[in-house]
């Protein structure tokens, strides 16, 4: 049994300027508020949904 939790590294590569307000709030919810900032998060369904909403602003890597 593999107990390793899958993590993903998310990097903001585009600005949220000019995008909808709820997309900016989603970035803040992911812990991203500046360009080229990266966070490592657990790969859960809620995180996947948030990432899917703003995927055009992000670079996503599996860890």
From Swiss-Prot:
One of its GO terms (cellular component) is cytosolic large ribosomal subunit. GO terms for biological process: translation. It holds the Pfam family Ribosomal_L30. GO terms for molecular function: structural constituent of ribosome. Keywords: Ribonucleoprotein, Ribosomal protein. NCBIfam families: rpmD_bact. Belongs to the universal ribosomal protein uL30 family. Part of the 50S ribosomal subunit. HAMAP family: Ribosomal_uL30_B (MF_01371_B). This is Large ribosomal subunit protein uL30. It comes from Rickettsia akari (strain Hartford). The gene is rpmD.
């Amino acid at each position: 049994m593999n107990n390793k939790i899958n993590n993903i590294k998310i990097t903001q590569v585009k600005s949220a300027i000019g995008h909808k307000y709820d997309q900016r709030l989603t970035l803040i919810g992911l812990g991203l508020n500046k360009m080229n900032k990266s966070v490592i998060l657990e790969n859960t369904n809620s995180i996947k949904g948030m990432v899917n909403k703003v995927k055009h602003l992000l670079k996503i890597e599996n860890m």
